[in-house]
Amino acid sequence: MKKAIKLINCLIFFGLVSNFSFAESYKNFVNEEIASELEEKGIKRIIHEDSSRDLVLLPNFEYSSKLLENRVEEKKKYTFISESLYLIDKSEILEKSNLSQDTVTIEDASRVVRSISKMEGMTYYSLHRKEESILYEKSYMIDSLETQNRIDDVNTGNADGQISYVLQDDHSFGECRYELRYFQNENSIYAVFKNVDSMGMGIFRVIDPEDMRINIIVTDCGDKFLLYLETETNCPKNKLIINKLEDSLIARVDAIYKWFVSSY
């Protein structure tokens, strides 16, 4: 009887351990300096204001090489690049969520990054206007680029290989369609947003089709998520446009982070 109880306890123990056996520490993906700053502040951000296109915060993720394949084409324009790296405690997500489970998995994160409709009505702080504004008046998946019929979020099951199309009515850029591609394994989810339409600010066409990317990689690190957000776009070399564009895109990254941590 005692042997049977010991065997059961061992099975339970190894079962629990196996849930985290593939989850690596976030320290395996970043250097000591970045790890220390993440531990202290929870975020590390770099805005590239020169001609360098090197992504200095991109962790050594499995999908990092895939991200590098999905960057905007280098052109004779001003290129804006923003990198943000977040260390997120899963317990903080659970406190704000409707989940009844005792942890958050990569499957949960996969569902969230495909819950595009939950972006609708989300707000951001406009650095230019110095006020809170609605970022997306509309945000939903569509059945195709041709018919553009609204459909429910396709956010169940494994996301690997999924291609979706999205329509968003953006406070800064107006109505725009995006192509979304997803890649997923047992520990990570990677999503890349690519604009299908040109994007404008007022009377100016600021961003050409396929000239904007929003890259999102989430990796499970046991009791934490390591979240990497990168935005980049080409735009005219006009100081006024550049300033407004940078303010808008930085605020957008902050809004995407809030969407990720609050949509469970």
Feature roles, as predicted:
Residues 19-23:
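Sec/Tat signal peptide C-region and signal peptidase I cleavage site
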Residues 25-171:
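Hydrophobic ligand-binding cavity/cleft-lining segments
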Residues 169, 184, 193-197, 222, ...:
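A mature extracytoplasmic/lumenal domain signature
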Residues 177-184, 213-219:
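Hydrophobic/aromatic beta-strand elements that line small-molecule binding cavities or substrate pockets
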Residues 200-242:
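Beta-strand/loop substructures that line and gate deep hydrophobic ligand-binding cavities in soluble
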Residues 236, 241-264:
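A conserved amphipathic terminal alpha-helix motif
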